[in-house]
């Protein structure tokens, strides 16, 4: 990675404005999944050990530019204190006199959590005045919020106009892993693309066709490809306006020598429920009033075999409606194949794929789980991320 990280700068006694991603799911004031808080710990601990004054900023939910009581970061600050085993202070604003006073009172190694940055309308507009206010609190800007790196906001990008800007350890690792996958992959390199909609994955498929040896397609978006081949798909998800594009992608794969894998059999159902009756049929045998909801057992075997023989696998998007037990087996099988594969480096591209490997208890068997759904998707599309571009070069 050619961007400076916290390892490249002197931090002792410095006030560090560290943008983290503490956008955790909450229920009735309780944190239901603290993965993102834990992911930021190595950076925070490093800053503390180096004698920095650690000022943490994050968004939580979508308060739309005003203070929303249940979206305050107070419970997050409390939990962070427990995880760090030290006192963590919490400011009720993200800039201004109160925040400035609290920062002025900090000693080396102290940790302060600012209020939800999205309580201010200027945050999502990348307002220069707000960015200046944030910058006034600190000597150095650290961006460790990979999950928000695709956003050009005041606390993720704008602030870098006014302070030296470096990455945190989590951001550094994300950029290293994803960057190596796209620029210098070990081969065979396989991408598994799933999820509901072709339109969400157009950029990724287009970009990866130039990079991969194998492209595996699953999830709801597969049926647009199946229909493009002339098969009947019943009531399965389909984007008719993307059929020509699907044909184009399959043709491109052929021209570029990429092995293009699609389901050969599918799980079908007449109703969406936990107790649904399902059948397994060949891809050319979906009845008119049934819909495909998962990849079938033959497909799972083929996909598992490709995974086993790959050196690098990037997975973005589930194979079926994994949230419901009867339609979860395909996604589980892909996860299991990755967990069992020896000598295969597995990169899980955030979002639903990350949720799936968590749900099936396979997370610790994956080489790297990205903390950014949208950000990793845009990175894999070959786009520049504003929260990365703004960092100082080495």
From Swiss-Prot:
Pfam families assigned: PGK
Nucleotide-binding found in the keyword field: yes
UniProt keyword terms in alphabetical order: ATP-binding, Cytoplasm, Glycolysis, Kinase, Nucleotide-binding, Phosphoprotein, Transferase
Pathway(s) per entry: Carbohydrate degradation; glycolysis; pyruvate from D-glyceraldehyde 3-phosphate: step 2/5
EC number: 2.7.2.3
Phosphoserine, modified sites: 183
BP terms from Gene Ontology: gluconeogenesis; glycolytic process
Entry GO CC: cytosol
Subunit structure as annotated in this protein's UniProt entry: Monomer.
Protein name per the record: Phosphoglycerate kinase
Species the sequence originates in: Bacillus thuringiensis (strain Al Hakam)
Gene: pgk
């Amino acid at each position: 990675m050619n961007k400076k990280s916290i390892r490249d700068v002197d931090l002792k006694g410095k006030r560090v404005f560290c943008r983290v991603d503490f956008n955790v799911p909450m229920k009735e004031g309780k944190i239901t999944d603290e993965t993102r808080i834990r992911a930021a710990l190595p950076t925070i601990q490093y800053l503390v050990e180096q004698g920095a004054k650690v000022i943490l900023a994050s968004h939580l939910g979508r308060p739309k530019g005003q203070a929303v009581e249940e979206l305050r970061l107070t419970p997050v600050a409390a939990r962070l204190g427990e995880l760090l085993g030290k006192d963590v202070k919490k400011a009720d604003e993200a800039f201004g006199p109160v925040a400035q006073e609290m920062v002025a009172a900090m000693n080396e190694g102290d940790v302060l959590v600012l209020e939800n940055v999205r309580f201010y309308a200027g945050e999502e507009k990348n307002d220069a005045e707000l960015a200046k206010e944030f910058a006034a609190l600190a000597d150095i800007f650290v961006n460790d919020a990979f999950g928000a790196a695709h956003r050009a906001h005041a606390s993720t990008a704008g602030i870098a106009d006014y302070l030296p800007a470096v990455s945190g350890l989590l951001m550094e690792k994300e950029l290293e892993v994803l960057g190596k996958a796209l620029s210098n992959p070990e081969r065979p390199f396989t991408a598994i693309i799933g999820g509901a909609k072709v339109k969400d994955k157009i950029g990724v498929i287009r970009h990866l066709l130039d990079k991969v040896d194998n492209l595996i397609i699953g999830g709801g978006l597969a049926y647009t490809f199946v229909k493009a081949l002339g098969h009947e798909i019943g009531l399965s998800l389909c984007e008719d306006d993307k059929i020509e594009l699907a044909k184009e992608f399959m043709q491109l794969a052929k021209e570029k020598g990429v092995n293009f894998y699609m389901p050969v059999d599918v799980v079908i159902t007449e109703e969406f429920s936990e107790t649904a009756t399902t059948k397994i049929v060949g891809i050319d045998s979906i009845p008119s009033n049934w819909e495909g909801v998962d990849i079938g057992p033959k497909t799972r075997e083929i996909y598992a075999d490709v995974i086993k023989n790959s050196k690098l696998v990037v997975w973005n998007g589930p194979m079926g409606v994994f949230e419901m037990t009867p339609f979860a087996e395909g996604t589980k099988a892909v996860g299991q194949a990755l967990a069992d594969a020896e000598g295969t480096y597995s990169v899980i591209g955030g979002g639903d794929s990350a949720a799936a490997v968590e749900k099936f208890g396979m997370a610790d068997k994956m080489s790297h789980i990205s903390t950014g759904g949208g950000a990793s998707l845009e990175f894999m599309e070959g786009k520049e991320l504003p929260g990365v571009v703004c960092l100082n070069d080495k």
